[in-house]
Amino acid sequence: MSNSRSILSQPEWRIVDQSSLGPTFHALQSFAMDDTLCTSIGKGESAATMRSWVHHNTIVLGIQDSRLPHLEEGISFLKENNFNVIVRNSGGLAVVLDEGVLNVSLLFQETEKGIDIDLGYDTMWHLIQEMLKDYDVTIEAKEIVGSYCPGSYDLSIRDQKFAGISQRRIRGGVAVQIYLCATGSGSERAALVRDFYNLAIQGEETRFTYPEIVPSTMASLSELLDETITVQDLMMRLLKTLQQFAPKLTPSQLTIDEIPLYETNLQRIIDRNNKALGLEK
């Protein structure tokens, strides 16, 4: 993993911590934040950045989910269970965010030779392994069939998935994003998504193959390690681990120059979300 180590080894990591903003912090704001930071980094106007974030009771759908035949019924079910629903601006499928899920974005500049997609994923996998290295467990990166939003870089312990990684690129910037289920029940989160798909598909044939979710394939880190590991615990581990790779961690929010771009990005993402959910008038 020497190449992923080289990406983590930055002269400075800019730290944008939004993990304790509470229930008013909306997931659409998060995607606008990452797009803004990715653009700044791509232009060379910002150091490599780690952004951490938590959203209360939110289901983030992928573009393919917005094409489900009975989407409205599925969304109504999620709202009845007190979940907000949005469609993200990148690939993948439905994931669950709540107070027990820490999201982390690593944002860095493309190199002249380019950073291939697998290297981006490997970098995040390496970071999580370093964060949890004092536990006597093997963290594997492979697809966990039966999980929600399955992919080849699902992170698992003993074949139970606790994290999923995605990636986005904007004009010379790379954003690698992960959700880490810290506390709560992984199988209950998975059952919620399973029931959503059942209501949104209702046995109809679809062009796209949606996952058949088996709740027992998913668990939180607290369940897997038999020890309560909170979002705050993971944040402390994350910052300590980054300190091993960079001499300087700089707490930050958006700069004055970044705010107008953020506002533009947010409006674009809101409009796209409304279109995907059929909320346009």
Swiss-Prot record:
GO terms for biological process: lipoate biosynthetic process; protein modification process. Catalyzes the amidotransfer (transamidation) of the octanoyl moiety from octanoyl-GcvH to the lipoyl domain of the E2 subunit of lipoate-dependent enzymes. Pathway: Protein modification; protein lipoylation via endogenous pathway; protein N(6)-(lipoyl)lysine from octanoyl-[acyl-carrier-protein]. This is Octanoyl-[GcvH]:protein N-octanoyltransferase. Residues 44-250 form the BPL/LPL catalytic domain. Belongs to the octanoyltransferase LipL family. It catalyses: N(6)-octanoyl-L-lysyl-[glycine-cleavage complex H protein] + L-lysyl-[lipoyl-carrier protein] = N(6)-octanoyl-L-lysyl-[lipoyl-carrier protein] + L-lysyl-[glycine-cleavage complex H protein]. The lineage of its organism: Bacteria, Bacillati, Bacillota, Bacilli, Bacillales. The active site is at residue 149. Signal peptide: none annotated. Its EC number is 2.3.1.204. The reaction proceeds via a thioester-linked acyl-enzyme intermediate. It is an enzyme of class 2 (transferase). The record marks 161 as: Lowers pKa of active site Cys. It comes from the Bacteria. Keywords: Acyltransferase, Transferase. The keyword Acetylation does not apply. InterPro entries: aa-tRNA-synth_II/BPL/LPL, BPL_LPL_catalytic, LipL, Octanoyltrans_LipM/LipL. It comes from Bacillus anthracis. The gene is lipL. SUPFAM superfamilies: Class II aaRS and biotin synthetases. One of its GO terms (molecular function) is lipoyl(octanoyl) transferase activity.
